[in-house]
Amino acid sequence: MATAGGAAGLAALLGGASPHLLIVSASEEPAGGCRPDADLLLFATPQPSRPGPAPRRPALGRPPVKRKLNLETDHQYIAESLPAARGRARIPGRGAKSPGEKSRYETSLNLTTKRFLELLSQSPDGVVDLNWAAEVLKVQKRRIYDITNVLEGIQLITKKSKNNIQWLGSQVAAGASSRQRLLEKELRDLQAAERQLDDLIQTCTVRLRLLTEDPSNQHAAYVTCQDLRSIVDPSEQMVMVIKAPPETQLQVSDPGEAFQVSVRSTQGPIDVFLCPEDSSGVCSPVKSPFKAPAEELSPGSSQQRASPLLHSAQDVNMLLPEALLPGTALPTKCPTEDVSLSPLASMDTLLEHGKDDFPGFLADEFIALSPPQPQDYHFGLEEGEGISELFDCDFGDFTHLDF
């Protein structure tokens, strides 16, 4: 019975439509004995299904091994390819939109806001009906409300009625435009002033270079107190003269805050002088251009009041035609008989006998701001010192007089 049952099961398995590989394991018992049907082990590997009638599943107590043996290749096991994923095939051109459908950018709130502002700018009085705006822009009215709520929150529009709004940005723009025009005018004025200053600086630089490089101007490279008075009036403005070595740094603060002048130099000392107001016979024998002379001097009086110490050859050329008349010899002494014309004369003699005749020459034109020296230099000269020792000046830089 067992053998008949096993044969029947084997026949049922082999009678199927799909091919199977049947493996039968033999028992270790003697050939005379037979095992029951339950001890018979059958292993079958299913093959891929083919179209046709569904085969009958063998009634076995153990499920078939899910393994495929391809005997046509050298390899014993080959992985089975996965079947195609089930589902609807992707229709080509599904993302394409119809010609009448709008894109996402065309329906964006940003573009709608720009178009709404264009409608506001085209309105003569700045009033726009929201219903009319929704029809013109071809958008829903709620999107127009989203725009108006934001614009009203930043105070660019105001509600005139339920569906009418008015633009307020023109008033703000008018105030800003007027201020912008004022700022532009101020900027143009500042640029014109800056160009004028640049031209003046360039002109002064060129003139100063030509003046200093010209050899014929070397003998006149100095400034007198009268030159400064011809520019400004010391009674109204304070004139200060700074004598400093080369590479001196001069810094001037803003006059609007606190006017300060800072002068620094590492090459030598810095001297600052104050140009005083003009007073009769104090600064210089040369008359100030701000005060008319009291009386015209005759040629005879000019001979008497002429300074015995001449500063330049120009003064000599001016005085010689007046002094040397026909039949007149060159005077060798001043009207004061005791005063000598020698440049090596003692300063004491000049102070004692000539101070009445030369009041302007003895007085300093500039007032030194530094404190005076405690020692009296008028009576402290040594035997080897001369008149040049009385002045803090290098007389070697002056041009020699040509008589």
Curated annotation (Swiss-Prot):
DNA-binding region: 87-171
UniProt entry tagged with the keyword Membrane: no
Protein name in UniProt: Transcription factor E2F1
Compartment list: Nucleus
Motif DEF box per record, residues: 135-171
SMART domains for the chain: E2F_TDP
Chain intervals for the UniProt region annotation (Transactivation): 335-403
GO CC field: nucleus; Rb-E2F complex
Family: Belongs to the E2F/DP family.
Region annotation (Cyclin A/CDK2 binding) ranges: 44-85
Ranges where the record places region Dimerization: 172-261
PANTHER family recorded: TRANSCRIPTION FACTOR E2F, TRANSCRIPTION FACTOR E2F1
GO molecular function: DNA-binding transcription activator activity; DNA-binding transcription factor activity, RNA polymerase II-specific; protein dimerization activity; RNA polymerase II cis-regulatory region sequence-specific DNA binding
Chief place of localization: nucleus
UniProt entry keywords in alphabetical sequence: Activator, Cell cycle, DNA-binding, Nucleus, Transcription, Transcription regulation
Subunit structure: Component of the DRTF1/E2F transcription factor complex. Forms heterodimers with DP family members. The E2F1 complex binds specifically hypophosphorylated RB1, the interaction represses E2F1-driven transcription. During the cell cycle, RB1 becomes phosphorylated in mid-to-late G1 phase, detaches from the DRTF1/E2F complex, rendering E2F transcriptionally active. Viral oncoproteins, notably E1A, T-antigen and HPV E7, are capable of sequestering RB1, thus releasing the active complex.
Any single GO BP term: positive regulation of transcription by RNA polymerase II
Spans annotated as Disordered: 45-64
Region described as Retinoblastoma protein RB1 binding: spans on this chain: 375-392
Protein role: Transcription activator that binds DNA cooperatively with DP proteins through the E2 recognition site, 5'-TTTC[CG]CGC-3' found in the promoter region of a number of genes whose products are involved in cell cycle regulation or in DNA replication. The DRTF1/E2F complex functions in the control of cell-cycle progression from G1 to S phase. E2F1 binds preferentially RB1 in a cell-cycle dependent manner. It can mediate both cell proliferation and TP53/p53-dependent apoptosis. Blocks adipocyte differentiation by binding to specific promoters repressing CEBPA binding to its target gene promoters.
